[in-house]
Amino acid sequence: MLDANIKQQLKTYLQMLRHPIELVASLDNSEKARDVEQLVQEIGECSDKVSVRLDGNYDLRPSFSIAKQGEEGRVRFAGLPMGHEFTSLLLGLLHVGGHPPKVEADVIEQIKGLQAPAGGAHFETVISLSCHNCPDVVQAFNTISALNPAFSHTMIDGGMFQPLVEQRKVMAVPTVFQGTQGNSTETFGSGRMTLEEIVAKLDSGAAEKDAAKMNAKGEFDVLIVGGGPAGASAAIYAARKGVATGIVTEKFGGQVLDTLGIENFISVKETEGPKLVAALEQHVKEYDI
């Protein structure tokens, strides 16, 4: 399932685990279940901090959960998290294993303070392994579930669970459903969503907290509305002049985030939207904006 190069990389990453974790697989007699069993067994061979059980009783089969040893699994993959989702699997292993996520400290505190929503605290994300936007959503909900025991999340490979896709009338991926385990049928959202957007939607007091943060800031000489390339460029220009500068935006990067291939950015032969936005954001953070 995993080639020698990936196994070696996995062994290196799993050295970052701070406490033992357990992979619990729920299997059936299908060929895909044998693939899932092989995957979890190979992961278990990469670290003495990873144990494997094959006696899970989760409804969706084949699937497997990642749990801190002695706890119930709150991060689960229904299907094979390969392709674009392999990074989601790797981060899920690390975060459940106690390695801190690369998230702003105030966002982590906000996640830890979330209360279980009235609509249920179990989320299911239907994905496609070829989807470019799906990993961000899967990783966001996995991070929330790893940090806050009130929440749990299952990634569902729509290609492997076609009857579920048809039953829930999934028309696009990623689509996120909310509810309780075994009954997550209410649509929470679809398409690209950032961790911050998801947390804000789950946090009933998010608007008041954001307003308080804004009120605590000083006055701005220049306040730029929009966080796309033009907004980032204008903000850097203003900040370099020594004036107090801020950016107001729903999501940094704007439409560029949803653009996969970019070949008309002068001096750069080819890049991708998320990669360009990450570079823009890092550049903006070099200044007091």
PLM region spans:
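Conserved hydrophobic helix-helix packing surfaces used for dimerization/oligomerization
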Residues: 23, 123, 222-224, 245
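N-terminal Rossmann-like dinucleotide/flavin-binding domain of flavoprotein oxidoreductases
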Residues: 36-39, 257-289
